[in-house]
Regions:
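Nucleotide-sugar donor-binding catalytic core of glycosyltransferases
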Residues: 1-210, 215, 222-245, 259-266, ...
Length: 292
């Protein structure tokens, strides 16, 4: 462990609202310490997102960098290091040059943007079958973005919001507390949709991509600069979901209308064969296997 509690502070937020348990950085650290696996590269044990969202981080950043540098000097590894990061902007401390970053939104290797839900809130909701879904495609969320152009969510709303087969609801600006009304809007509209939009936001990924599957609906991942879907060595995304660059939004309606019931259900069935990779347990196992 890095000899400073600053690297292990609790996360002050509960976001998304369906989280009940640990964030993936927390789960990975906890499970790593319990199992002490042998890996080629050395794991840098830190809860990056937890301390980087704190208001005090900038004041302590220089001190934390010094502590991290000392830890690296005292824990040499010829093969290099690796970190596991959720934070959109990656690690805000300087890492050794030979570090692999398993990142949810940026880094070296894409990983799922997920969290632990011990209650299985979304999975336990009764699903609606293909024939009874009344909406072709929906979205409930805000128009969050960063400075990477084009702005995916703006473009998505401008292109699709007026089409009768699409139901897009702007829930307002991003807030770490999602009220019950917006939770219900997301759940009910997603359940009743054959497809649901999962555009990148500030980061390259989206929690909703993984949540949509849990509601028995197929997500549409929309990206601009880099496609950040994880584990393509093991997952065939052509069999799993719709994956488009934002320049293809004009074609999306025709793409969806040409997917029949059999193809749709095959996607959901394929999801059941790979969904363990979208869990904190499966993510831990995958990274340890890659590092072994």
């Amino acid at each position: 462990m890095i000899p400073s509690s600053l690297f292990y502070c609790a996360n002050k937020d509960t976001y998304p609202p369906f989280k009940n348990g640990l964030y993936k950085e927390e789960y990975f650290l906890k499970t790593f310490l319990e199992n002490n696996p042998i890996t080629k590269r050395k794991y840098i044990p830190a809860l990056w997102t937890n301390f980087q969202i704190e208001g005090w981080f900038q004041s302590y950043k220089e001190n934390m960098q010094s502590i991290l540098d000392d830890w690296v000097l005292n824990n040499p590894c010829e093969n290099g290091y690796y970190v596991v990061v959720q934070y959109d902007d990656n690690c805000l401390l300087k890492l050794p040059e030979n570090t692999i970053i398993y990142g949810s939104c940026s880094g070296s290797i894409p990983i799922p943007l997920i969290y632990q839900d011990k209650h299985n809130t979304l999975e336990n909701i009764s699903k609606i079958n293909f024939d009874d879904k009344t909406i072709l495609c929906s979205f409930v969320g805000n128009i969050t973005s960063n400075k990477v152009l084009p702005n995916v969510r703006d473009l998505m709303f401008n292109t699709l919001a007026s089409k009768k087969n699409f139901k897009l609801i702007n829930s307002g600006g991003w807030n770490p507390v999602v009220n019950k009304n917006n939770q219900d809007l997301f759940i009910n509209n997603t359940l009743n949709s054959k497809f649901a939009l999962a555009p990148r936001g500030y980061g390259r990924s989206s929690f909703r991509f993984f949540e949509i599957f849990k509601l028995g609906t197929i997500p549409i991942y929309i990206w601009n600069d880099i496609d950040w879907l994880p584990f393509k060595d093991e997952i065939n995304y052509n069999k799993l979901c719709i994956n488009i660059h934002c320049s293809q939004l004009d074609d999306l309606e025709n793409i969806l209308l040409n997917i029949d019931k059999e193809t749709y259900n095959n996607m959901l069935n394929y999801y059941t064969t790979i969904k363990h990779l979208f869990s904190v347990e499966g993510l831990y196992e995958k990274i340890i296997n890659l590092e072994s």
